[in-house]
Amino acid sequence: MPVASLSLFRFDGTSSLPWVISQMILSRRPLNDEPRVKFYKLCGSGTGEGFTPKPNWRVWAIMAAFDTEADARDVTANHPVWKRWRAHAAETLVLHLQPLSARGTWGGVNPFLPEQVAEPSPDEPVVALTRAAIKPHKANAFWSRVPKISEKVGEDQNLMFKIGIGEIPLFHQVTFSIWPDVAKMNAFARGDTPHGKAIRAAREEGWFTEELYARFRLLGTEGSWMGKDPLASKVLERETA
């Protein structure tokens, strides 16, 4: 079963920034040499609700894909790259994800293709990932929509977890969010909402050179975020259901 893992690393202050920047370069070779890592991206993050062009220098991420859950858990726990990042960070949260559906590409490939496309159960949490490469001359149109979307994100009490990450500030963006169920996710993402209007405008006006949309089931979490694991109870509910 293919599995994706999102590893988030939070640093206190900016004193670790030179080390982080160096690792954005130095981590690539050992990741390229690890056969169990089928895909990876090293990413920064955004401030505020996460979906902003202003970088958050304290939060960084590794998005990776594996052939099995066992590989995902072993690599993120024991590989030297993850161990180095974890040792330097003040806090680490790793989320393991089972792909349910994925369309589009990221860097020319779709790393999250499931063995079989599936819909999440009506009452289980759903993880949504959207990745877009923005055309430079469309960046203003894209980012002009973001404040209203971020405002709604901050107000939505249904949202369980959220973060915006990206490979290249302004132009390569990833939104990652977790919802209690698919109905609540669709209520935010579609229809006559700021997000729904932005999606329609993106398609009509051709904002992106590349897009990927994926849904996942939350398999498990490791570590903490802001002093706790914000998703542990949801994983426990799934395992005991």
Curated annotation (Swiss-Prot):
One of its GO terms (molecular function) is metal ion binding. It catalyses: spheroidene + 4 reduced [2Fe-2S]-[ferredoxin] + 2 O2 + 4 H(+) = spheroiden-2-one + 4 oxidized [2Fe-2S]-[ferredoxin] + 3 H2O; spirilloxanthin + 4 reduced [2Fe-2S]-[ferredoxin] + 2 O2 + 4 H(+) = 2-oxospirilloxanthin + 4 oxidized [2Fe-2S]-[ferredoxin] + 3 H2O; 2-oxospirilloxanthin + 4 reduced [2Fe-2S]-[ferredoxin] + 2 O2 + 4 H(+) = 2,2'-dioxospirilloxanthin + 4 oxidized [2Fe-2S]-[ferredoxin] + 3 H2O; spheroidene + 2 reduced [2Fe-2S]-[ferredoxin] + O2 + 2 H(+) = 2-hydroxyspheroidene + 2 oxidized [2Fe-2S]-[ferredoxin] + H2O. Binds 1 heme per subunit. InterPro entries: CrtA-like. Its cofactor is heme. One of its GO terms (biological process) is carotenoid biosynthetic process. Its EC number is 1.14.15.9. Pathway: Carotenoid biosynthesis; spheroidene biosynthesis. Keywords: Carotenoid biosynthesis, Heme, Iron, Metal-binding, Monooxygenase, Oxidoreductase. Belongs to the CrtA family. Involved in the biosynthesis of the carotenoid spheroidene. This is Spheroidene monooxygenase. It comes from Rhodobacter capsulatus (strain ATCC BAA-309 / NBRC 16581 / SB1003). The gene is crtA.
